[in-house]
């Protein structure tokens, strides 16, 4: 089913809501076009409390997909979490179906936006950029949904322009879905600037670096290793670099750093995130005592112990602390706080935070993600471990204070790929990469059984179920994923 209308907010810009649009009076000029693109193309890609794809709460893409793997766990037992934590997906499960139910209709909103801005009398260069941003957003959202659910519904412009007619849009084929994603991202990459610096007026908007990063992830999903390498090389031309100290990536003072490919800009009263509120125990001592602490998210002890003790990335994970009650809590004396694992602190404190809401930017994609994907894609495309693949892995590995790998350290391709998977887990936990990585390696279900003790995980759960409401309302014309 398709739902027509525009709703959104984005980045650090004024947000507007367009539930219905009189196209004879809006949009008519460049400002209207910009507002429409901000609402439609950027609306999904935000982190604001309980809103947006990248929120830190129960509706967040990164937190929920990582929670279904060996990386994260949650102490809360309300109705939302068990299906994810135990990989017990059904067509009526809240979290597994929510991303499709919430965001699938935004594909159509972006298609309508492309049509509505095409005829506006404005500077051609600006119009071309806005079209590219909208196509980047559509391709990105389509990729996210495709990764989670497989082929998606793609309504035509004709259907979208006749919202009063009930038209059931079936799921597109795999080939049609991939083509939409690929075409949109390639078109965007041809137009958008490589990157923006924090001082740029358009900082926070989509870039060539983002378009190629998402396209690289699509090709990794499709096992098109050579094409993934090509995309990685394009990102490497965009001017990104690794931040020297891992912990500095995630701080208020270092927002907009050169490692960041895309982040959700958080600003007091506009968009605010709740990671620390979801992680910290009530008795955890913070420099700012006004941060709310709900004692939820954890890093399982088995994953914590997979780090080398010398790994500097452990600096943003807390395995022991002296509580405000004077008691020392750790793995052997967990109390009610560390029984499910260490504290995945990740982000720096917001010194002016007075509630659950922080204005530290939420990381979405960064250069370390691309470099480690490059290492994997290079090895897979050559069917052998190459020096270049080892070098890309070392770019990230040595930043963590660990000794560089040598080519001779790896006795086989599988040995190297295992090292890459481990590195990506240690580097990118909490950033939403693990589920896709494990599926690509054929380990997602195995890990759910081995590390989460799941008795319900099945191979078909590599894809999440579409909401049952979508199937019911379509009278069966929209086909559910196998197994559900």
Please report, for each region that a protein language model flagged, where it lies by residue:
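Flexible, polar/acidic helix-loop-strand segments at domain edges
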Residues: 76-77, 81, 85-87, 305-366
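TPR-repeat structural position
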Residues: 225, 384-386
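Acidic, glycine-rich segments characteristic of secretory precursors and extracytoplasmic regions
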Residues: 10-63, 112, 175, 477-484
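Short, surface-exposed recognition loops and adjoining beta-strand edges that mediate ligand/DNA contacts
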Residues: 24, 51-74, 152-157, 193-214, ...
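Long, intrinsically disordered, low-complexity segments
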Residues: 9-12, 30, 41, 93, ...
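Conserved, well-structured interaction surfaces
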Residues: 34, 42-47, 74-149, 172-176, ...
């Amino acid at each position: 089913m398709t739902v027509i209308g525009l709703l959104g907010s984005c980045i650090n810009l004024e947000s507007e809501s367009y539930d219905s649009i009189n196209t004879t009076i809006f949009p008519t000029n460049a400002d209207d076009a910009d507002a429409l693109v901000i609402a439609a193309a950027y609306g999904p890609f935000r982190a604001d409390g309980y809103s947006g794809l990248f929120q830190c709460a129960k509706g967040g893409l990164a937190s929920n997909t990582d929670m279904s793997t060996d990386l994260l766990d949650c102490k809360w037992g309300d109705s939302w979490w068990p299906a994810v934590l135990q990989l017990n997906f059904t067509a009526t499960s809240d979290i597994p179906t929510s991303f499709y139910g919430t965001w699938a209709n935004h594909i159509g909103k972006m298609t309508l936006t492309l049509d509505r801005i095409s005829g506006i009398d404005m500077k051609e260069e600006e119009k071309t950029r806005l079209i590219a941003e909208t196509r980047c957003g559509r391709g990105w959202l389509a990729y996210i949904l495709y990764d989670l659910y497989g082929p998606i519904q793609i309504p035509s412009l004709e259907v979208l322009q006749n919202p009063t007619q009930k038209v059931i849009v079936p799921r597109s084929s795999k080939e049609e879905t991939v083509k939409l994603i690929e075409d949109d991202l390639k078109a965007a990459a041809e137009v958008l600037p490589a990157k923006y610096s924090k001082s740029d007026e358009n900082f926070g908007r989509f870039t060539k670096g983002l378009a190629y990063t998402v396209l690289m992830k699509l090709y990794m999903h499709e096992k098109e290793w050579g094409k993934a390498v090509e995309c990685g090389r394009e990102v490497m031309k965009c001017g990104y670099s690794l931040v020297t100290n891992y912990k500095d990536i995630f701080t208020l003072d270092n927002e907009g750093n050169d490692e960041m490919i895309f982040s959700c800009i958080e600003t007091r009263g506009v968009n605010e995130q709740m990671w620390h509120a979801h992680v910290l125990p009530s008795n955890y001592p913070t420099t700012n005592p006004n941060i709310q602490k709900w004692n939820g998210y954890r890093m399982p002890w088995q994953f914590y112990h997979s780090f080398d003790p010398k790994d500097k990335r452990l600096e943003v994970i807390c395995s022991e602390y002296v509580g405000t009650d004077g008691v020392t809590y750790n793995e052997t004396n967990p109390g009610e706080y560390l029984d499910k694992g260490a504290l995945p602190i990740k982000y720096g404190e917001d010194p002016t935070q007075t509630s659950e809401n922080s204005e530290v930017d939420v990381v979405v994609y960064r250069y370390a993600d691309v470099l480690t994907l490059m290492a994997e894609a290079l090895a897979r495309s050559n069917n052998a471990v190459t020096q270049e693949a080892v070098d890309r892995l070392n770019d990230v590995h040595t930043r963590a204070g660990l000794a560089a790998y040598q080519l001779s350290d790896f006795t086989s391709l599988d040995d190297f790929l295992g090292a890459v998977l481990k590195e990506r887990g240690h580097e990118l936990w909490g950033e939403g990469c693990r589920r896709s990585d494990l599926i690509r390696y054929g380990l997602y279900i195995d890990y759910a059984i081995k590390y989460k003790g799941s008795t319900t995980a099945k191979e078909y759960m590599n894809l999440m179920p579409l909401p049952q409401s979508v199937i019911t309302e379509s009278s069966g014309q929209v086909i559910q994923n196998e197994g559900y």
